[in-house]
Amino acid sequence: MLKRLLKRPSLNLLAWLLLAAFYISICLNIAFFKQVLQALPLDSLHNVLVFLSMPVVAFSVINIVLTLSSFLWLNRPLACLFILVGAAAQYFIMTYGIVIDRSMIANIIDTTPAESYALMTPQMLLTLGFSGVLAALIACWIKIKPATSRLRSVLFRGANILVSVLLILLVAALFYKDYASLFRNNKELVKSLSPSNSIVASWSWYSHQRLANLPLVRIGEDAHRNPLMQNEKRKNLTILIVGETSRAENFSLNGYPRETNPRLAKDNVVYFPNTASCGTATAVSVPCMFSDMPREHYKEELAQHQEGVLDIIQRAGINVLWNDNDGGCKGACDRVPHQNVTALNLPDQCINGECYDEVLFHGLEEYINNLQGDGVIVLHTIGSHRPTYYNRYPPQFRKFTPTCDTNEIQTCTKEQLVNTYDNTLVYVDYIVDKAINLLKEHQDKFTTSLVYLSDHGESLGENGIYLHGLPYAIAPDSQKQVPMLLWLSEDYQKRYQVDQNCLQKQAQTQHYSQDNLFSTLLGLTGVETKYYQAADDILQTCRRVSE
């Protein structure tokens, strides 16, 4: 009995190819077909036929690819690859509403082990285990009967390819205009079609990475200090805090009814309520905000081998330090002193390879005390990073309850999810306030200033979308509108004639973006170069005396 159960089932090659093609193209593309139904109403027989033709085309394409690969005995490994990739893509698309594109592949490559662990849920393991791993094992377990005639096998496979090609041509002849209109008006649809979405996105990522090995492009080689800032005995110290996954609409400084920024509300900061990010993922936004390229003309491949604003500031003679608690600076700090404080794994501050952002202050007091000359310190926070929001803040910051204390955020109620996310912002408020107080403690030695700017926002289940990383053109504002604030010591305002009342009024009426960071940092630190654009410097119009 057991022997009979364990006996390998057998199929002829053609049947195996058809079965594998059906599973990959139909069963692993449920997410794609669901999205098609949202864009294509089945309100007429014609639209019904257009929709029904799509599985036919998907099946035919995969059938052709697998059949061609069988001539090289690659049909099993290729089918297994398609199954594993398709199962993973479908899970993340259906669970989090993501899009598989180059940015998402970059996110996957940049994901730390701790972040990967945080994404692992029982649902994920079961889904990928059954639809991916088990299906791939079954594809390998099924025995393919040897062909009785090699010529007959070749002819059958050739006929199989021909029929698939004819089906594709028939659909094209009948519905080409419908397909062209549907995919032209819904360009992101194709990014849900597996396994082509993962293959195209991976190739695009590889092409961009290959260009990153080009020689370094130097910019701002004319950089020098403004004499007004260089000739004073009192030195200048600026802290830039790069936020992670903080969305503007949940900042109480932005008008959010909940008090998520109780400390910053008392710090006399200038908050900029209309600030847009450069991208919807860290891998895009961080290198973009430190580059001299505006979002509309931003080129990822160039940013990977071109200097940024920190290089220019350092070249002008300012000490630069980057403290990282978010898995790396994505190239923005490659040529300045930097350290991964997460790796310190400090007790009471770190959990499963991730740390609370307070770890960023470890050794910072000593660094400032020993600092000779002007300085810029960048603190790269983990902020509200997905999806284990409840691990981003210590227990004492659990202000809003009940919370979503799981990485299966889609299983939590809206109230639980928002409560947990808002608690991360209460902790962000604490971190930024702590940095301001640190600067205040050193005002006897330095003229101080601080900038906080988040890399991108976050979706919390609105319209079935979670996390971030959607293509910019279709991403909701919750992923693109980010908090930005500026704190200037009274000494800075007096010494460099900056009118804070002017800044407050300007902040409420003007629209800003991460494009402003490059020239604002140069102006804030008094670095002059031809790359500086006064129109992008937030402080420029509120300086009483021209520098």
UniProtKB/Swiss-Prot annotation:
Q: Tell me the membrane topology, using the record's own terms.
A: Multi-pass membrane protein
Please give the start and end residues of each transmembrane region: 13-33, 48-68, 80-100, 124-144, 155-175
Keywords, alphabetical: Cell inner membrane, Cell membrane, Membrane, Transferase, Transmembrane, Transmembrane helix
Q: What class of enzyme is it?
A: transferase
Q: Which family does it belong to?
A: Belongs to the phosphoethanolamine transferase family. EptA subfamily.
Q: One GO biological process from the UniProt record?
A: lipopolysaccharide core region biosynthetic process
User: Might you give the EC number(s) for this enzyme?
Assistant: 2.7.-.-
The organism's place on the tree of life at top rank:
Bacteria
What's the stated role of this polypeptide?
Answer: There are several lipid A forms in this strain, including a phosphoethanolamine (1-O-P-pEtN) form; overexpression of this gene leads to higher levels of the 1-O-P-pEtN form of lipid A.
Q: Please provide an example of a Pfam family that matches this protein in its UniProt record.
A: EptA_B_N
GO cellular component terms, A-Z: plasma membrane
- Consequence of gene disruption: Decreased amounts of the 1-O-P-PEtN form of lipid A.
Task: State where the protein is found.
Answer: Cell inner membrane
Entry's Gene Ontology molecular function annotations = phosphotransferase activity, phosphate group as acceptor
Q: Which SUPFAM superfamilies would you find in this protein's record?
A: Alkaline phosphatase-like
What is the protein's given name?
Phosphoethanolamine transferase EptA
